[in-house]
Amino acid sequence: MADTPDLTQTPPTIYDVARMAGVSIASVSRVLNGRRNPREETRERVLQAVAELGFVPDGAARALSGRLKEVVGVVIRRVRWTTTSDGGFAEEDESLQFTDVLNRGIELAAQRRGFNLLVSSVDADDHDASRRLLALARKSDGLILHDRVLEPDQLDELARRVPIVTLANVATRTTTNVHSDNTSGMQALAVHLLADHGYRSIGYLAGLADSPDSLARRETLAAEAAVAGAVLMAGPEWQGNYYATGGARVIEQLLADGTTLPRAIACANDQTALGVMYALAQHGIDVPGDVAVAGFDDIPMARHLRPQLTTVRQPIQEIGTCAFDVLHSMIGGGAPAARDVLLPTRLVIRASCGCPTISPPRRLP
């Protein structure tokens, strides 16, 4: 990480001036460039912020302040790995259906506002991520980050350059986080599996090791398993990566090691569950007769699996729409109503958990 740029040394930007003065970027532009006659109160606030920050507008800054780029950068975290096992898993390069639906929500909201998207991806082990995001920030009016691609302190420093909305349940001092309610969603799923079905052992097949969402779901499941007196299997050998091949790889390795599988498996997301169900079928293990399986997300594919997948529905497209709307407000100089925007989840009961029929989504209390 020695080549990571030191964002703390970057000069103040027009975004900093607008944020400190509590006005829009356009208002800062009018004051600095003498366009129209801004209100005296606005002029004084802008000039005071300029003085306190030591902001010196150069040609590029004036160009930026005079006209927004009308571009938002969207950053996705990708996972790439290989394995030499006889199972034949290839290099990871799957498309997450969750990401596709989420990006559609961002895109629809952006189109309504006349904005375009710059979509970029970084690998999970990309040590140059901060430099790449810095370059993307220069081309954008704001950033939406799907996953945890920077450490919180780096994220705060980058947010001094452009407004940032995160979708990875990462709380910082200067960014706004839009995400779904992991706790209530996993609670509802755990109660259904452990209390309604009475399963006495349950595994949790995790997402990425540093994913706040995956960790939150695991903690909730662990708490509910303790209350129910059920055995939870969630050690390092249950570490996935949010992809179907990651879920299949874990099951293949557990079976190769002679591990007795739990009665139910809750997965960090639906694509992991897809891989789990595929691997179980390859070994003649019946779902849900031998092992019940559940996911989290309710991606389109969940209802087309056989058996159909019991899962927790996130309002995926709405998360994207909400994220852009919040970011657009921040780009205009407004302060977000909240630094943490929480959207509700629903338990969707289908057949993979052992229920005989499909039920409509059950709204959580």
Feature locations, PLM:
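Bacterial carbohydrate/catabolite-sensing allosteric modules
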Residues: 1-7, 20, 51-52, 86, ...
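N-terminal helix-turn-helix DNA-binding module of bacterial transcription factors
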Residues: 1-71, 75, 357-365
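Short beta->alpha connector loops
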Residues: 55, 122-126, 146-151, 271
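Amphipathic helical "hinge" segments at domain boundaries
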Residues: 56-131
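Structural motif
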Residues: 75, 144-146, 266
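Short acidic active-site motifs
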Residues: 128-132, 153-154, 246, 250
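Short acidic/histidine-rich motifs immediately flanking catalytic phosphotransfer sites
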Residues: 136-142, 259-263
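Acidic, Gly/Pro-rich loop/turn segments at junctions of secondary structure
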Residues: 144-154, 169-175
